[in-house]
Amino acid sequence: MFYTYYYTSPIGKITLASNGTHLTGLWMEGQKYFPSHLPADKTTTLLSVFRQTQEWLDAYFKGENPDYLPNIELKDTPFRVAVWEILKHIPYGETVTYKDIAKEVARQNNRQSMSAQAIGGAVGHNPVSIIIPCHRVIGSNGSLTGYAGGIERKIALLKLEGIDTGKFTLPPSKDTKNPLR
């Protein structure tokens, strides 16, 4: 069975997905790579994993750093899952670069190097946004490049965590509104 639940957040409607025991997806409305269709199965009660996720999100959007993760099940290629596991360990209120993650993946696989672009592809397809904090990943030049939920949401999440976004830059095509300040 496949279940969905909708959570209303300060950054818009969020869709949660579960297999009944684990969180399998968390997408913001209009997010890039949002599933084109979700199965029709619905839950008539608030599943335990949805309650756990809702509590996590409630705390997070109050500016708190939840000290646990909901039960999450990640299924994809071994490469993507490895990248998402690394993302889970980026501390609240901190950022890392795609290059940093590439170095860590290379280290874990006894390789000399790894493409930061390949890392970007995996980060961009993270199925559990916010909780697996892909919004904390930036370009090595300080650019807030790429976020499937949109640059404005990435900035809002970083600010919520107390990060000074004024020190970052926007990709050239996104620099019209300057939402960093």
Q: Where are the language model's segments positioned?
A:
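A generic structural signal for ordered secondary structure
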Residues: 13, 17-19, 47, 119-120, ...
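Histidine- and/or cysteine-centered catalytic micro-motif in compact active-site loops
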Residues: 12, 28-31, 75
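Nucleic acid-binding interface residues in structured DNA/RNA-binding domains
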Residues: 3-10, 55, 64-181
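A sequence-level detector of short linear motifs
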Residues: 15-16, 25, 97, 146
